[in-house]
Amino acid sequence: SVTPAQFTEHMDYLRDANFQVLPLAQALADIRAGKPLPDKAVAITFDDAYRNIYEQGFPILKERGFPFTVFINTGPVEQGNKSFLTWDQMREMQRFGGEFANHTVGHPYLLRLEQGETVEAWWSRITHEIEQVETALTTQLGESPKMLAYPYGESDAQIQEYVTDRGIIGFGQQSGVVYQGSDFANLPRFPAAGHYAKLATLKTKLNAKPMPLID
């Protein structure tokens, strides 16, 4: 959804415009603790465990020394799907600033019950989707950053409460700036791929400020 040439252009802009690319988990911890971030702080995320992140994106990031986070769905990884990352590739990326977080096992639309499924069975399935990835991250990569990107960006109050109770930070796909007053059960992110890959409009997003609402 973004070409290597476009991605290189984005990364060169971050470097040339003196953005401070930070590890996502550490940046969020600092925000919540009230610790100031550097000026022009930004974090880079990918959703899904596609192998082209390793083949196309990782060399560009490594060359510039930029940390990044990949939210992985572990189902195709465990199945050995050739289009998805391997655990060994993830371990290599970890050594150069890669961080891997939860995107569920099978990338389901979390709010949809399957045909004939009860609410109780749906809830058991959804919590299993989340918990199984947390276990896999710890077992395979030695740690989990306790972050979850909701598949398709969708969640509800029950899922968000469940995530929060387990110390996990949730991410949607709605646009916005993260700041101390953000909802850490459903944080926003700016898209930078597909229709949103054009650098001219991406610059506006990267230079945006939060606008807290009092009422």
Q: Which role fits each region the language model picked out?
A:
Residues 154-171:
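Short, electropositive alpha-helical surface patch
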Residues 155, 175-208:
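A cross-kingdom marker for long, charged
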